[in-house]
A protein has these predicted regions:
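Terminal helix-turn-helix DNA-binding modules in bacterial transcription factors
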Residues: 55-96, 113-122
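Short hydrophobic/aromatic patch on the recognition helix
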Residues: 49-50, 98-99, 103
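Helix-turn-helix DNA-binding elements, focusing on the entry/boundary residues of the two helices
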Residues: 35, 46, 84, 100
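Helix-turn-helix/winged-helix DNA-binding modules
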Residues: 30-31, 79, 91, 106
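Short, Lys/Arg-enriched, Trp-marked, Pro/Gly-tolerant hinge/linker segments that flank
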Residues: 1-23, 27-41, 55-63, 67
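Core residues of bacterial helix-turn-helix
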Residues: 42, 91-92, 103
Length: 122
């Protein structure tokens, strides 16, 4: 019974760390894009974070950051008239090329293609 209690406690603390991680990503995704940044804020190693996320059957910590940046990029593309360069600046990319590469890798199409296909649906 004691072993089961320890496992339950570990899981609860894991979920708490995951919750804190998601909150930190929401707050800092524009300026911090590395798991190491968040690991430092949580006083954990990136490997420990990865293990916790894996145990909880969640996407990797890096994937969480990428999905948050992707969601904000898509929101800005759909609901603002900002250029890809302006969006790259807002999201903290060094330049438009870095943003464009990131967006194409994660969504399978360029930012301009995404905006155009979505506008065609409205």
């Amino acid at each position: 019974a004691r072993n089961r209690m320890n496992i339950t406690r570990e899981k609860e603390s894991g979920f708490e760390i995951v919750r804190q991680y998601y909150n930190l990503v929401d707050e800092h995704f524009r300026t911090k894009k590395q798991v190491q940044d968040y690991a430092d804020m949580l006083h954990k190693s990136p490997k420990t974070l990865s293990n916790i996320f894996s145990t909880c059957k969640l996407p990797s910590p890096l994937r969480v950051i990428h999905e948050r940046v992707e969601a904000e990029a898509k929101r800005l593309l759909l609901y603002s008239n900002k250029s890809a360069k302006e969006i790259a600046d807002i999201l903290g990319f060094e330049d438009q090329a870095s943003f464009s590469r990131f967006f194409k890798n994660i969504s399978g199409q360029s930012a301009v293609q995404f905006r155009n296909t979505q506008e065609g649906k409205n």
